[in-house]
Design a protein with these regions (language model features):
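N-terminal intrinsically disordered, cationic/polar leader segments
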Residues: 1-131
Length: 131
């Protein structure tokens, strides 16, 4: 028995040697009986929109699939786009939440952005959308 995706040609990012940021997310059909998908990275970086200083953080993405699942390489390269962009922690959580919701149309999606301390304050922003 195999888990091979029959239409793998549709996953162009996964099959490529792309090593630069991308703005699109790729998907594949959700397998039966998967109730929650969770991604975590401790490598989220962006730029403070006021000072231009780098911001570092941890990002957790959770969603309940409807018909589609998110392909992880395209997610990694999508998150890379924020390295050179200025965003507040809250705006970044909101933007990522909306992008995933618009792409997957899941039953719900929650994005938790935990920004590392700056000025002695750690910021956590949680974005949430449900159908």
């Amino acid at each position: 028995m195999t888990d091979m995706f029959e239409n793998s040609e549709e996953l162009s990012v996964l099959k490529s040697k792309i090593n630069k940021p991308i703005d699109n997310l790729e998907t594949f059909p959700a397998p039966k009986n998967v109730t929650v998908v969770k991604f975590f990275t401790d490598e989220l970086t962006s730029i403070c929109p006021i000072t231009g200083q780098p911001d570092f953080g941890e990002l957790t993405i959770e969603y309940e699939p409807n018909k589609l699942c998110l392909e992880s390489k395209s997610l990694k390269l999508y998150l890379w786009t924020f390295r050179e962009e200025g965003h507040f922690c809250e705006a970044l959580a909101s933007k990522i939440t909306q992008k995933i919701f618009d792409t997957l149309k899941p039953k719900w999606v929650r994005v938790t952005n935990e920004q590392s301390k700056r000025g002695g304050i750690e910021t956590t922003a949680i974005g949430y959308i449900e159908e």
